[in-house]
A protein has these predicted regions:
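N-proximal low-complexity "stem/linker" segments adjacent to membrane-targeting elements
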Residues: 1-31
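A conserved acidic beta->alpha catalytic loop
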Residues: 28, 35, 43-53, 70
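Membrane-interface aromatic/basic loop that binds lipid-linked glycans or pyrophosphate carriers
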Residues: 270-328
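Glycine-rich, basic loop-to-helix element that forms the pyrophosphate-binding segment
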Residues: 69-85, 95, 106
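Short aromatic/hydrophobic "clamp" motif used to bind/position activated sugar donors
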Residues: 90
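Donor-binding/catalytic cores of nucleotide-activated saccharide
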Residues: 74, 95-202, 213, 217-223
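Short alpha-helix within the catalytic core of nucleotide-sugar-dependent glycosyltransferases
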Residues: 23-27, 51-55, 87, 100-112, ...
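Catalytic core of nucleotide-sugar-dependent glycosyltransferases
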Residues: 209-215, 221-252, 261-264, 270-288
Length: 328
């Protein structure tokens, strides 16, 4: 049974060397109970059979268009998809993932019923051993402040929902002045706070029909010093934004996480990365001074973060010493 037309959804699927998974991904969109969709396949300069497969899929399914471009990375591919989208809504789907039949219907009905500019669905993580685990946040609207408070306090894997772009339904107008930062890894981290800030209403939908396939090709599984530094930069940008909103507690919580990222960058990095690291450490220290409060010192993680602020080299040495001796 088809669903009523509540607005065209542009499903943007960047594709780079994914001939093994792309068809399953696209056909999961074709099978949606909500049929008012266009599929935008962005072939990002693939070197395998992906370009030909994209063309074959487009010839088979009229709702699918293909854009071939030079390799520019995930951000550039998504931006290309946005530029060609004609839908009222945008939905980002990674090419090695897939969605259940009611995913788009659930999200667009939630958007329509709650006048939401962003609807955030849950997801189901599929491990390499094919074990599935669902993550979802209960239905309901949230303010911008409450959104980030929840993100800060959620210590489970479901905190992923607060950061990533995939599995969310966005009003197209949110991207009138926002684009993914090209050349950056952790691209979602750089813009999600801007999107949440611009949205009139953000709604959580507890459906877990986005199937996130965890594999060793993922960015998180193949972190380089440069990609780690991109993650640090994104966290610092968001911490600074929180301070402009006078959310010092949220900024401090995020700086605690940033400290862990800083500690994850090894000493044996190149000169360019070392320069970036030094710059980010200085910025981290500046943000720490602006966000720390007396109450922070009554927290274990607050005390350890303060120790890192005062004695970063000593902290790193002691941490590595403890880890060498099997103490976490």
């Amino acid at each position: 049974m088809s669903c009523p037309d509540l607005g065209l959804i542009s499903v943007i699927i960047p594709a780079y060397n994914v001939e093994a998974t792309l068809l399953k991904c696209v056909e999961s969109v074709i099978r949606q109970t909500y049929q008012h969709t266009e599929i935008i396949l962005v072939d990002d300069g693939s070197l395998d059979g992906t370009p030909d497969l994209c063309d074959e899929i487009a010839s088979r399914y009229p709702s699918c268009m293909v854009i071939h471009r030079e390799n520019g990375g995930l951000s550039a591919a998504r931006n290309t998809g946005i530029d060609h989208a004609s839908g009222q809504y945008l939905y980002f789907l990674d090419s090695d993932d897939y969605i259940g039949d009611i995913e788009l219907s659930s999200l667009v009905h939630a958007a329509n019923d709650n006048r939401a500019d962003i609807v955030i669905g849950g997801f189901t993580k599929i491990s390499e051993s094919n074990v599935s685990e669902a993550y979802a946040i209960p239905d309901g609207s949230v303010s911008e402040l409450n959104y980030w408070q929840r993100a800060s306090h959620d210590k489970t894997y479901s905190r992923t929902e607060y950061i990533v772009s995939w599995g969310k339904l966005f009003k197209r107008q949110l991207f009138n002045s926002i684009r993914f930062d090209e050349g950056k890894i952790h691209e979602d981290e750089f813009i999600i706070h801007k999107l949440i800030a611009d949205a009139q209403n953000v709604y959580f939908c507890s459906v877990s029909e986005y199937y996130y396939v965890s594999n060793d090709k993922s960015i998180m599984s193949n972190e380089t010093p440069s990609s780690k530094l991109d993650g640090i930069e994104a966290y610092l940008c968001r911490s600074n934004y929180f301070l402009t909103r006078q959310w010092s507690d949220l900024a401090f919580d995020l700086l605690i996480q940033t400290k862990q990222l800083l500690l994850g960058v090894n000493d044996d990095i190149g000169d360019e990365d070392r320069t970036r690291f030094s710059s980010y450490l200085r910025e981290w220290r500046s943000l720490y001074k602006r966000s720390v409060s007396f109450s922070c010192l009554f927290r274990i993680d607050g005390l350890s973060t303060t120790f890192y602020y005062l004695f970063p080299m000593t902290y790193r040495f002691l941490k590595e010493l403890l880890e060498t001796n099997g103490v976490e």
